[in-house]
Amino acid sequence: MAIRKYKPTTPGRRGASVSDFAEITRSTPEKSLVRPLHGHGGRNAHGRITTRHKGGGHKRAYRVIDFRRNDKDGVNAKVAHIEYDPNRTARIALLHYLDGEKRYIIAPNGLSQGDVVESGANADIKPGNNLPLRNIPAGTLVHAVELRPGGGAKLARSAGSSIQLLGKEASYASLRMPSGEIRRVDVRCRATVGEVGNAEQANINWGKAGRMRWKGKRPSVRGVVMNPVDHPHGGGEGKTSGGRHPVSPWGKPEGRTRNPNKASNKLIVRRRRTGKKHGR
């Protein structure tokens, strides 16, 4: 993938860039693997906003991705196409299995049309192959990693991300996350070899607010520029600092939003570096 920069013909195009989509081999998705996707604009069943800054955006269809791959062990698959997916930053690969079934997977870096991938404990260590962690050598970069055996891939699924397998001890494997956190995971959990493709996604300059609106993201307004009725930081004559420690629109202090008693915390060997005091 490469990035194509626009000429500064308008203020919105000045500095803006876009993917050249050179790796895409087909523009229409596999119809049998597409499901309707209905936007809710951040509203719940009562019509109340539960997630702010969402709404609008281009219509999308959901592509069904195989995040498990545990029922195709020993069945080879050929990469038929590399496709664009509007629901994620990574590209997706359409696999044609030898038994006739078609499935989507997240496309790793280096996977191209015509390649053959497989899954199972005896699969080769090459990009796109899916194996249990116990069968992957230490030092290997992997993605689409399960947190629980058979639970489906949860970790390292976005563009350019990868996890390094540091080692294995007893029934656990030590993984270095993209955040720098080191976590232990059951060796029966499966992972896909390689790193996720489309790494240049992080370097795209969106250029204008309108491109964010196309993605369904609405403006995020600071509390200090609101009125007192709308936010605890609102009001005041002229510019103010808010007058208090940062809080949410409902008065709750910022930070420390994670559950300190989460059961899986005991599997964290080293926490990620946050750059803030008190481990927030």
UniProtKB/Swiss-Prot annotation:
Superkingdom field: Bacteria
MF terms (GO), sorted A to Z: rRNA binding; structural constituent of ribosome; transferase activity
Alphabetized UniProt keyword annotations: Ribonucleoprotein, Ribosomal protein, RNA-binding, rRNA-binding
Pfam families referenced in this protein's UniProt entry, alphabetically: Ribosomal_L2, Ribosomal_L2_C
GO cellular component, one term: large ribosomal subunit
Basic residues bias (residue ranges): 37-58, 268-280
Residue segments, region Disordered: 27-58, 226-280
BP terms from Gene Ontology: cytoplasmic translation
SMART domains: Ribosomal_L2, Ribosomal_L2_C
Assembly information from the UniProt record: Part of the 50S ribosomal subunit. Forms a bridge to the 30S subunit in the 70S ribosome.
Free-text function comment from the UniProt entry: One of the primary rRNA binding proteins. Required for association of the 30S and 50S subunits to form the 70S ribosome, for tRNA binding and peptide bond formation. It has been suggested to have peptidyltransferase activity; this is somewhat controversial. Makes several contacts with the 16S rRNA in the 70S ribosome.
Family per record: Belongs to the universal ribosomal protein uL2 family.
NCBIfam families: rplB_bact
Protein name: Large ribosomal subunit protein uL2
The organism of origin for this protein: Mycobacterium marinum (strain ATCC BAA-535 / M)
Lineage of the organism: Bacteria, Bacillati, Actinomycetota, Actinomycetes, Mycobacteriales
Name of encoding gene: rplB
